[in-house]
Swiss-Prot record:
The gene is RPL39. Component of the ribosome, a large ribonucleoprotein complex responsible for the synthesis of proteins in the cell. The small ribosomal subunit (SSU) binds messenger RNAs (mRNAs) and translates the encoded message by selecting cognate aminoacyl-transfer RNA (tRNA) molecules. The large subunit (LSU) contains the ribosomal catalytic site termed the peptidyl transferase center (PTC), which catalyzes the formation of peptide bonds, thereby polymerizing the amino acids delivered by tRNAs into a polypeptide chain. Pfam families: Ribosomal_L39 (PF00832). The keyword Ribosomal protein applies. This is Large ribosomal subunit protein eL39. Residues 1-22 are annotated as: Disordered. GO terms for molecular function: structural constituent of ribosome.
Length: 51
């Protein structure tokens, strides 16, 4: 990745960074909850974003 990024690339990377976090614990405690973990977690080495 270049040090000088275009603004659109930087926006995409910022969104991906925000999405790449674990599930909040209070969501797991809700009634009738079936979500156990964030299935869309991304590791920077294993899975690339294709941008």
């Amino acid at each position: 990745m270049a040090a000088q990024k275009s603004f659109r690339i930087k926006q995409k990377m910022a969104k991906a960074k925000k999405q790449n976090r674990p599930l909040p614990q209070w969501i797991r405690l809700r009634t009738n909850n079936t979500i156990r973990y964030n299935a869309k977690r991304r590791n920077w080495r294993r899975t690339k974003m294709n941008i």
